[in-house]
UniProtKB/Swiss-Prot annotation:
Cofactor: binding comment: Binds 1 zinc ion per subunit.
The UniProt record lists the keyword Zinc: yes
Keyword Iron: no
The protein, known as: 7-cyano-7-deazaguanine synthase
Binding site for ATP: 10-20
Amino acid sequence: MSNQQALVIFSGGQDSTTCLIQAIQTYGRENVQAITFQYGQRHAVELERARWIAQDLGIKQTVLDLSLMRQITHNALMDDTAAIETAENGVPNTFVDGRNALFLLYAAIYAKGQGIRHIIAGVCETDFSGYPDCRDVFVKSMNVTLNLAMDYDFQIHTPLMYLTKAQTWALADEMGALDYIREQTHTCYNGIVGGGCRECPSCILRERGLAEYLESKKAV
């Protein structure tokens, strides 16, 4: 697929870094770009990690400012004074209404301008945190909407959609990137790189998946 280009929605976290490395191996480094969004997230370290990884992997990164979201919605992911909690409906208060819809929209606008048709997102509904915009049905509906809105044949890829966190770690290992992702990526809601705080929902999910994968690997 070296004659095609891909745009990866990139946060510097485990999932999007896994997708970025896979895209490099699939499309070729020279055919891959990353797009990152500054939307008022709790910790600047997320943007710093994304910038560092993109540079380290030799990938062109574009950062877009979507901080206006703070004017119209409030949640714990954009307020570092708020405690992270899960509502009765099972959705954590770190869920940002409309975030992935906006990410896909702006990624598509950018991609079309660059002549890119393949958009890659690291969303997953198997081990997801209860976020409705991580579901496959949402991504497929956005793909149709964007194609109609821009009269352009986008193909949104979600390679992690049906993988558990353990399987995502296995994929990283298959690509020779397990240690890189383990040590360099940022997933923690409390702003701790690598191993994280081990207490927030994101860290718990990440560490549980890693432990499960390493245990299964040991048993082989």
